Amino acid sequence: MAKKATTAKTKTEKSIEAQLWDAANKLRGNIEAPEYKHVVLSLIFLKYAGVRFEKQHAKLVEQYGDNKILVESPMAYAKDNVFYLPEECRWDYIMANAKSSDIAQKIDKALAGIEAKNKALEGALPSNYYSSIGIDSAKLGSLIDIVNNMEQHMTDDDDFFGRVYEYCLSNFALQEGKGKGEYYTPKSIVNLITEMIEPYKGKVYDPACGSGGMFV
């Protein structure tokens, strides 16, 4: 009896995380994994921050109408743990300029602008990184398109960005080799430690949290 086509598709179909990784990796060119990881992860952050901002922005517009003072108040975003993004730091702006020759500089300015408006991120984001590594603007634009298409695979109850971020971290750790993936702790070890210490109450202090994946 012939096998069902749906079964074969299930076995061969790649996850969206794997598809994104493969597509992004093809655009890497001569950039080494330790460098390229910042390119990919920063774009994922910008997309994530942009999605969260737009949802909060729409909520505020519905509540306050065209009152820009209230709609554009950083505090109105911070109270719900959303980063406030100036116009030139928003994902729509990045997408609109994705094919421009100075897109690297625009991304650097976006990251700097987000830090300036959100003190909790001070020193956490790459500074003038895209401009310094000399990545081809056409390849960077294509990578932005890939990251932009992530949104169509999201659902309201799914931590999609968390899964993609963790997937990329694990793959970069593998590419960098032994001793160079210190920032990433395998999920199996994270689960084991969490089950052992049962951190379900109070506060957790970790002065060497790295990417923060264990907290997530």
Regions found by a protein language model. Give the residues of each.
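Conserved SAM-binding loop of SAM-dependent methyltransferases across substrates and taxa
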Residues: 211-216
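Non-catalytic, mostly N-terminal accessory regions of nucleic-acid modification and defense proteins
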Residues: 1-200
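Conserved class I S-adenosyl-L-methionine
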Residues: 201-208
